[in-house]
Amino acid sequence: MNLIPRTSIVVYLKHMKHERQIRKYGHIVHSNRDRKFVIMYVNEQDVDQIVHKLMQLKYVRHIDGSPYKYLKKTYEKEKHEIYN
């Protein structure tokens, strides 16, 4: 079984009724009706094409990418000095 690298994107919508049409572009993980956004996973190799297609839709306000792959994932134990 091969794992396909995926990344998350946040899609801000004008109306949440369009959430169903967004489903065909990726896997929706979370949606917030108050703030009108959807968090979805898409294949990493197809991100540019999917973002381009989503931006052409009239009910999409803007799209943010996930900063996860740029975050530091390994942490070293910090040494704290104790002052008396």
UniProtKB/Swiss-Prot annotation:
**Keywords tagged on the record:** Cytoplasm
Note whether ATP-binding occurs among the keywords: no
Q: Which domain of life is it from?
A: Bacteria
Q: Where in the cell?
A: Cytoplasm
Q: Give the record's GO CC terms.
A: cytoplasm
Cited InterPro entries: DUF2129 (IPR016979)
**Keyword Cytoplasm recorded:** yes
- What family does the Swiss-Prot or TrEMBL record give for this protein? Belongs to the UPF0298 family.
The name this protein carries in UniProt is: UPF0298 protein SAOUHSC_01072
